[in-house]
Amino acid sequence: MGLQRKSLLGLKDMEKSEIESILDSTESMKEIVQRKNKKLPTLKGFSMVNLFYEPSTRTRSSFEMAGKYLGADTTNMSASASSVAKGENLIDTGKTLEAMGINLIVMRHPLAGAPRLLANNLSCSIINAGDGYHEHPTQALLDMFTIKEYKGSLKGLKVTIIGDIYHSRVARSNIWGLTKMGADVRLAGPPTLLDQRVFTEMGASCYYRVEDALADADVVMALRIQRERQGKTLLPSLREYARLYGINQERFKLAKKDALLLHPGPVNRGIELTSELMNSEKSVIEEQVTNGVAIRMALLYHLSGGEDNGDIA
């Protein structure tokens, strides 16, 4: 079963079967990423634009690579170097791109709901590459794929997410996705960065002591402290955060012996994670980056109607 939609705006409203379809397709895409000749004609004639209103290295680059590996015409566009800087509004920008024949827009925006606004006003496909605090669905999908690769299944796993939960669109998408797949999601962070009421209603368990959340975990995911989104009163200091919530090898021992360590990046070394732990065999952070290209290839394939055209390779 393919995706029953033309756009990917979030995982909250995505069916479990759709997530499974994407994860299954990603296995084939990863084989393509890892081989010497990566170029395919699958999306020849398909045009996509990466429209980013916020800085990005991993997400934008991986979408660009994903499109190029499948043969799509891919263009990167930053808000600061476009008519947006002259005051053009979002819908007008989208309509301009659509008038040029663009088939798909990948968009990152600081305001929650911006991708949905665009999707409601355009006929081309939209992929949400992160909107405010709301969602970052492709990051959660690549996280789930990475976990599934190592653990075989997501069902019944205890997944602990630690850090700046309040400002994290990655955490929100992971909660929606992982709980749909049957995982037990635990959250840990300072009280100022973890609203128990909101996240409990989403299906996660909340802890203020990181040690309690780490106990017997199958997967540990650290999140970046988003200093650009915070007021100065939310954390006493980064040193204090590292002391209470930073993950080091001693704390990591509270998780299961075969526990995995994930981080969406970029990492503030010595704050969220120690370099020693990040460089250990527990870490699958580099694998997440590889899988990010593969998961985005799978999404482009599905949203372009690629499954109607036969085999990938």
From Swiss-Prot:
Self-association and partners: Heterododecamer (2C3:3R2) of six catalytic PyrB chains organized as two trimers (C3), and six regulatory PyrI chains organized as three dimers (R2).
Record-listed E.C. numbers: 2.1.3.2
Record GO terms (molecular function): amino acid binding; aspartate carbamoyltransferase activity
InterPro entries attached to this UniProt entry: Asp/Orn_carbamoyltranf_P-bd (IPR006132), Asp/Orn_carbamoylTrfase (IPR006130), Asp/Orn_carbamoylTrfase_sf (IPR036901), Asp_carbamoyltransf (IPR002082), Asp_carbamoyltransf_Asp/Orn-bd (IPR006131)
Pfam families found in the cross-reference section: OTCace, OTCace_N
HAMAP family the UniProt entry points to: Asp_carb_tr
Pathway: Pyrimidine metabolism; UMP biosynthesis via de novo pathway; (S)-dihydroorotate from bicarbonate: step 2/3
Record's protein name: Aspartate carbamoyltransferase catalytic subunit
Function, in words: Catalyzes the condensation of carbamoyl phosphate and aspartate to form carbamoyl aspartate and inorganic phosphate, the committed step in the de novo pyrimidine nucleotide biosynthesis pathway.
Keywords attached to this entry: Pyrimidine biosynthesis, Transferase
PROSITE patterns for this protein: CARBAMOYLTRANSFERASE
Signal peptide (residue range): none
GO cellular component: cytosol
Family: Belongs to the aspartate/ornithine carbamoyltransferase superfamily. ATCase family.
Presence of keyword Transferase: yes
Binding site for L-aspartate: 86, 169, 224
GO biological process assignments: 'de novo' pyrimidine nucleobase biosynthetic process; 'de novo' UMP biosynthetic process; amino acid metabolic process
Catalyzed reactions: carbamoyl phosphate + L-aspartate = N-carbamoyl-L-aspartate + phosphate + H(+)
